[in-house]
Amino acid sequence: MLKPGDPGGSAFLKVDPAYLQHWQQLFPHGGAGPLKGSGAAGLLSAPQPLQPPPPPPPPERAEPPPDSLRPRPASLSSASSTPASSSTSASSASSCAAAAAAAALAGLSALPVSQLPVFAPLAAAAVAAEPLPPKELCLGATSGPGPVKCGGGGGGGGEGRGAPRFRCSAEELDYYLYGQQRMEIIPLNQHTSDPNNRCDMCADNRNGECPMHGPLHSLRRLVGTSSAAAAAPPPELPEWLRDLPREVCLCTSTVPGLAYGICAAQRIQQGTWIGPFQGVLLPPEKVQAGAVRNTQHLWEIYDQDGTLQHFIDGGEPSKSSWMRYIRCARHCGEQNLTVVQYRSNIFYRACIDIPRGTELLVWYNDSYTSFFGIPLQCIAQDENLNVPSTVMEAMCRQDALQPFNKSSKLAPTTQQRSVVFPQTPCSRNFSLLDKSGPIESGFNQINVKNQRVLASPTSTSQLHSEFSDWHLWKCGQCFKTFTQRILLQMHVCTQNPDRPYQCGHCSQSFSQPSELRNHVVTHSSDRPFKCGYCGRAFAGATTLNNHIRTHTGEKPFKCERCERSFTQATQLSRHQRMPNECKPITESPESIEVD
């Protein structure tokens, strides 16, 4: 054992400088420090375990007693000890604990706690002497090497006294650590307390699905709901097209003559409402006076009595929304949206389930017109009338027809006024009729270059309406209508004298019939007319009609001489050219008179 004051004794000690510095911080009032004297030498030479450091002594004690610095195993291990010796031993154990913490910081190893049966109860008593508030944790930070203090007790060195301390309850700590794992996912279909659970088609409040019009999706407004996950639009798109919802996307329209269209980016369920349609409100007087030239994006707003209130014009893109690019359907076969007026707004409602990638095409339905008591009838233009010069003049000259019936003739009806509706050259030839007088309008003539003739329908299935047997083919220049496409191809339009021969498939026109015939060959691969009996497809409506007669047995072409009937006109002409085949009924051997 080293003797106190031995000059060579320090050569045998390997003490970390950080360890000495820590002891100097614990005992700043000890002159040269606790290492002077026999107490320090005995403490360093004895293989005593290291324990965390205790709190600093009170200010009135300038220097701790020398006996309290030296652990005495004999006195500590004795079972009978006085209260004074117990308190002294507790402070000694705390000093050893402080030395252990400093040694851990300096890189020195300490003995395990299980090998210290004597110091364990004393350390537990020291910890129990400073209880913490229940269910609270203290988080402290210090900038110096002193120990981190928790609670309201006195700090260690000068650096430890000014350190910030944070408190949080055990419930808060448990919520931030494990609260996300206990989150409960609530399905959306459990929310049944919506006050607007209403079917607007039949104007009835319901608690569930409407049995007539399907699920209730009237609150699913797609306008203005932008998608952050959607792909960035091309930079050349205007601002009003960059805020598309995630359910739709911009596409090339299938309607001839129109550039853009809106298609479904995902499956849109039947009954989904899209809207409201945004635009500029126009009084009826302004529209009827001819101030609006483009009526393609014009919708009407009626009151409960069926009186026209105003128009909503979406022709100006900066004051409208992306809904203006939802095009009008040309026939019922391609229609998937219907126009619905709810209060003073226009909405589009999905009448069928729209698959992904299908273009959205809108038009009226029967419930829209029956709600206001406005009859929806098929109209056709009388070919004997003069050629109209404007769109409104052509619409006003049309006569209302009764639903077409093969077994009866068309009944004459009175001429009625047609209200302005969104019209495109390829839109379906329907109009809403009103009982008031005719409208005088000054609409300018539509540019012929932007017109496209209504070519063959995209679907050959018959329309599921009372007008399924009445197909109209309309000239894009003079608006004359024909029942067959071949008649439209043979039609010579007077609006363009230089190029009167117009193709029935596209908008091209030619000056000579031979040029038109050569051009029609390019459309020969298109066979939109399909037979419902055998499934064969044909390029023209006349060819299909001739083929259908082979299934039905109808022979409308009858020879006047021999009264034989044929299914096609070519068969009749060939029969009449044959001299030995066509024999009149009156020419018989019994009826021949001989002079």
Swiss-Prot record:
What is a GO molecular function of this protein?
zinc ion binding
Q: Give positions of region: Disordered.
A: 27-90
Q: What spans are recorded as compositionally biased (Low complexity)?
A: 71-90
Give me the reactions it catalyses: L-lysyl(20)-[histone H4] + S-adenosyl-L-methionine = N(6)-methyl-L-lysyl(20)-[histone H4] + S-adenosyl-L-homocysteine + H(+)
Cite the record's Gly residues compositional bias ranges: 30-40
GO cellular component, alphabetical, reads:
nucleus
List its EC numbers.
2.1.1.361
- Domain of life (superkingdom): Eukaryota
What start and end residues bound the annotated signal peptide?
none
**Compartment(s) of residence:** Nucleus
Question: What Pfam families does UniProt report for this protein, alphabetically?
Answer: PRDM2_PR, zf-C2H2
Q: Which residue numbers delimit the SET domain?
A: 246-365
User: Compositional bias of type Pro residues: which residue ranges?
Assistant: 49-59
Which GO annotations describe the biological process of this protein? methylation; negative regulation of smooth muscle cell differentiation; negative regulation of transcription by RNA polymerase II; neurogenesis; regulation of gene expression
* Entry's disease: Patent ductus arteriosus 3: A congenital heart defect characterized by the persistent opening of fetal ductus arteriosus that fails to close after birth. Fetal ductus arteriosus connects the pulmonary artery to the descending aorta, allowing unoxygenated blood to bypass the lung and flow to the placenta. Normally, the ductus occludes shortly after birth.
Q: How does it assemble?
A: Interacts with HDAC1, HDAC2, HDAC3, CBX1 and EP300.
Family that this chain belongs to: Belongs to the class V-like SAM-binding methyltransferase superfamily.
What's this chain's function? Putative histone methyltransferase that acts as a transcriptional repressor of smooth muscle gene expression. Promotes the transition from differentiated to proliferative smooth muscle by suppressing differentiation and maintaining the proliferative potential of vascular smooth muscle cells. Also plays a role in endothelial cells by inhibiting endothelial cell proliferation, survival and differentiation. It is unclear whether it has histone methyltransferase activity in vivo.
> Per its record, how is this protein called by name?
Putative histone-lysine N-methyltransferase PRDM6
The scientific name of the source species is Homo sapiens (Human)
Q: What is the lineage of its organism?
A: Eukaryota, Metazoa, Chordata, Craniata, Vertebrata
**Gene behind the chain:** PRDM6
